[in-house]
Amino acid sequence: MKRWVGSLIILVLFILQTTLVDYIKIFNTKPDLTLIGVITAALFCDQKWALLLGLCAGALKDTFATQALGINTVFFFLWSVLVIKARRRFSLDFNGARALLIGIIVFLQAVVTRVIFLYLGIPVALGIFLRTAILGSAYTALVSLAVFKVLRIK
């Protein structure tokens, strides 16, 4: 994937996430399109560019997030590193495997974020956390299949 294409994909997905995705919430949970873009870049772009895109996408999401500042910047970069390492070790040749990887990463992002919030003294109810973690990861994985279809990734 060319550099400008990866940047454009992440930018378009971020704009969609901040504007239109609010209208397709399921149980007040919406997919993380920016994370889909970061993982797609980590899967298909060269290593340095994918890491830079992960860092920039995390910083972009942090500017509009109400969470602790910097959490997405750090974790999007780390997810990019892990996906780059995983693509060397595992066969991620079909969209089902990629969607499963995205679902797992979104679930881990929710778990790590909750642990950080608990450490910072910000309580998150268990029911809200479970709904966000389970439904959010499944919803994001399903939406990633649609994103791959639109991008014509096979």
Task: Name the predicted role of every residue range.
Residues 1-154:
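Terminal, non-globular segments
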